[in-house]
């Protein structure tokens, strides 16, 4: 793909050059641990700390009160060439405690020992109760200016650039859990705007398990490991989770999303993000509009398949964290468009019969198109995980003028919870003064003292009104940029503990989601429910879950029941008949391949000229080539030698988005079961390394593009991959193979990772299928090209495409 056809790569290179002024990683392969290559021997010549890697940056060097300091980031890092204690005193030894003789007792006066051990004993802070496992990056948000008619927030203005820090996370797992578990993902963004910090604290799923925050401890207690054994870790496939969600049916919609491919994303870079709740925007004249926030990834929405996710969790539990950091280091900067669905701010706060205050409901994009308002680009990795990713503190109440909350009862509870949790996790009320949390707007509050106070406040009158400090700080009005809550009218009523009747429908929207899936996506949902419920011990919970599924779709219920070996419950009340929302499907479009990882399998006898050409072409296209060989080192000699990044012992298919073979590699000398279990019990005389056959067969089974030339077809045949199967590419040259593989990568997977034949298609009455129609979904140009996966029936006309021009609701 040429640069002219790859605008994302051009943007990334421009941003890298202008924003960071950096060069890419060596040989285009990310993952270098430090900014300099270490010598074999221990360095002994004193020198100062190395600079960070070119892809890394830290928090802006503003003061605890938001004032620019002019200091460089190196000024707030460690300095000097010699080891010191915490007070700056140089040390001559840090390997031996101070003792009464070489074999004597350690002396109490050893202040260095006490300081070093005491600090180590207190290095850990309480992990987040939820979203403990996370990864983050710095970036910039550029407003399009298109939201000016409905929102006065300055950062949404045309071409306004705002620094951001984004943290992605799982929900249930502890800090050390695996990345690729089936779970909801957090997508939290901190905007350092000129008017203060704005936090958009969202998820990759647009609905939530509960409608009221008072139930949050219940759903999390149910999803977390069982309290007696502390197992299973980072899993929902256990009795307590399914006990709760089958008894508490408002969780049905979110549970269905979790069981879909959305629960096992391929990458943080390939996730949608959602604000979940309905917010209220305010324009310059005081008019209001209700909105839902969406993040739309420029790389599309893609997932792993379940077996792949499980293998990845064992082979590389840091897969998503590594993927994000490596992509940024390689210059393939992830991008998302921020968009809003807009609704009139009517007294009922409903739209097309959907209660906008219910966080378990969506508004289909066909009814309210997502209007883009800005572009997010992540262009730098953190310099220190603890100081930035671990200590960042988000809060739904961090708002700026122009953005207000609604009466969503879950959102209202979150407004309390986020501040409360930081008091324990970050050790007091001054967490906003931590460098990563510092606003870039001047702070003149009257909050004083407390644990970890780092601001040195002046004056004698931290109260209002005062005269001793000249009356400062003064109150601002709306004209001076003050945050003024919308004077929304509160309907008269009695104090009650109940939900509105509109919250009672727990099954129409889950059915809408199910009907919106293609057949292969439905197969994955069936498999997920069958797996998760199959892990439950109590049959009563499985039977109860089937009763819930029967209220979503009869076919779904019957398939899961068959997998569990249980009878499907009899049909109950008639099922809802919502119009499907094609925008909910992940299947059918093509996307840029930026940051995709391609494994090139070769050895010294392979077509090394083709390998070199392939590497260069992949790098030019914004992808990452990794050479896989029987052993490490280099292939070939001289200046043209090709560096090996992975061996048959260290590689596994889950790392690659595509695999190409540049010949028939020799069997590795370590292809013995005693050395590497992946080799199995294959005979030493076997022509092809069994670990390579495993890699290729897994890639084929997971629907990945596979290519071969120069005899590599023999390996494909030995691995059981039909040479004429969809997604299997053979050719006479590396260039010929790469062109087809790149095209396949644009669709992510062949058949969405389901190459083996599916069951016969469902009846037309069950899946709304029929001949001769077209699949549509919302895209920037309004339509999506035809997709052969699931045609619409004439009796079920797809919704009209959204308008091309942005239209805002009438106030």
Residue spans for each PLM region:
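Active-site-adjacent pocket-lining segments in enzyme domains
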Residues: 575-609, 615-626, 630-782, 809
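Active-site-adjacent core segments of small-molecule enzymes
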Residues: 2-605, 612-620, 624, 629-648, ...
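Short, positively charged low-complexity motifs
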Residues: 717-718, 790, 795-797, 808
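Short, solvent-exposed beta-strand-terminating loops
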Residues: 343-347, 790, 803
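Short linear motifs in low-complexity or flexible loops
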Residues: 798-802
């Amino acid at each position: 793909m040429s640069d002219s056809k790859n605008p994302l790569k051009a943007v990334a290179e421009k941003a890298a050059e202008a924003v960071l002024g950096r060069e890419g990683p060596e040989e285009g392969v990310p993952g270098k641990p430090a900014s300099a290559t270490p010598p074999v021997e221990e360095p002994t010549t004193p020198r100062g700390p190395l600079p960070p890697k070119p892809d890394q940056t830290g928090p802006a060097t503003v003061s605890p009160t938001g004032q620019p300091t002019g200091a460089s980031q190196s000024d707030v890092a460690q300095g000097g060439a010699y080891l010191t204690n915490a007070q700056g005193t140089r040390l001559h030894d840090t390997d031996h405690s101070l003792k009464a003789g070489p074999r004597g007792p350690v002396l109490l006066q050893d202040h260095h020992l006490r300081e070093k051990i005491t600090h180590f004993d207190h290095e850990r802070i309480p992990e987040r109760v939820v979203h403990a496992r996370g990864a983050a990056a710095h970036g910039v948000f550029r407003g399009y200016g298109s939201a000016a008619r409905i929102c006065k927030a300055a950062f949404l203005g045309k071409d306004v650039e705002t620094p951001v820090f984004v943290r992605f996370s799982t929900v249930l797992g502890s800090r050390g859990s695996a990345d690729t578990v089936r779970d909801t993902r957090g997508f939290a963004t901190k905007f350092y705007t000129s008017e203060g910090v704005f936090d958009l604290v969202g998820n990759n799923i647009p609905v939530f398990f509960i409608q009221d925050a008072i139930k949050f401890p219940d759903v999390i207690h149910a999803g977390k490991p069982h309290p007696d054994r502390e197992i299973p870790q980072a899993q929902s496939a256990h009795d307590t989770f399914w006990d709760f969600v089958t008894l508490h049916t408002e969780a049905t919609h979110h549970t269905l999303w979790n069981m879909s491919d959305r629960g096992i994303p391929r990458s943080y870079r390939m996730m949608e993000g959602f604000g979940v709740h309905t917010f209220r925007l305010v324009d310059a004249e005081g008019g209001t509009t209700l909105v839902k926030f969406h993040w739309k990834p420029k790389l599309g929405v893609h997932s792993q398949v379940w077996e792949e996710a499980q293998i990845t969790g064992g082979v590389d539990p840091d897969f998503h964290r590594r993927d994000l950091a490596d992509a940024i280091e390689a210059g393939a900067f992830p991008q998302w468009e921020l968009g809003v669905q807009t609704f009139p701010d009517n007294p009922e706060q409903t739209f097309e019969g959907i209660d906008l205050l219910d966080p378990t409901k969506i508004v289909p994009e066909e009814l309210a198109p997502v209007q883009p308002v800005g572009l997010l680009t992540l262009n730098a990795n953190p310099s220190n995980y603890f100081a930035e990713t671990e200590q960042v503190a988000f809060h739904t109440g961090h708002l700026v003028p122009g953005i207000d909350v609604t009466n969503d009862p879950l959102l209202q509870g979150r407004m309390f919870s986020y501040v409360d949790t930081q008091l324990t996790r970050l050790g007091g009320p001054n967490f906003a003064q931590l460098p990563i949390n510092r606003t870039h707007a001047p702070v003149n509050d009257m909050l004083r003292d407390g644990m970890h106070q780092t601001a040195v406040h002046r004056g004698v009158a931290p109260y209002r009104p005062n005269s001793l400090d000249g009356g400062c700080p003064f109150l601002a009005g709306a004209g001076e940029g003050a945050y003024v809550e919308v004077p929304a009218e509160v309907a008269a009523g009695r104090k009650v503990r109940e939900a509105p009747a509109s919250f009672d429908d727990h099954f129409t929207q889950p059915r809408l989601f199910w009907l919106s899936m293609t057949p292969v996506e439905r197969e994955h949902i069936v498999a997920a429910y069958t797996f998760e419920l199959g892990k439950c011990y109590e049959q009563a919970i499985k039977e109860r879950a089937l009763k819930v599924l029967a209220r979503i779709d009869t076919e779904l219920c019957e398939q899961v029941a068959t997998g569990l070996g249980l009878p499907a419950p009899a049909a109950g009340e008639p099922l809802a008949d919502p119009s499907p929302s094609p925008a909910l499907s992940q299947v059918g479009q093509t996307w840029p391949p930026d940051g995709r990882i391609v494994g090139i399998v070769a050895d010294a006898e392979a077509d090394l000229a083709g390998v070199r050409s392939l590497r260069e072409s992949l790098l030019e296209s914004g992808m990452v080539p990794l050479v896989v060989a029987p052993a490490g080192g280099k292939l070939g000699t001289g200046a043209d030698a090709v560096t090996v990044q992975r061996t048959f012992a260290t590689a596994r298919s889950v790392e690659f988005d595509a695999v190409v073979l540049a010949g028939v590699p020799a069997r590795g000398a370590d292809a013995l079961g005693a050395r590497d279990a992946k080799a199995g019990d294959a005979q030493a005389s076997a022509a092809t390394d069994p670990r390579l056959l495993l890699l290729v067969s897994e890639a084929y089974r997971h629907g990945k593009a596979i290519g071969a030339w120069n005899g590599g077809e023999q390996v494909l045949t030995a691995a059981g991959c039909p040479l004429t199967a969809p997604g299997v590419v053979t050719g006479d040259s590396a260039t010929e193979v790469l062109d087809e593989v790149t095209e396949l990568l644009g669709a992510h997977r062949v058949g969405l990772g389901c190459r083996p034949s599916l069951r016969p298609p469902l009846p037309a009455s069950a899946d709304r299928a029929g001949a001769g129609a077209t699949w549509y979904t919302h895209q920037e140009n309004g339509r999506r090209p035809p997709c052969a996966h699931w045609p619409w029936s004439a009796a079920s006309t797809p919704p009209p495409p959204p308008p091309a021009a942005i239209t805002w609701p009438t106030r």
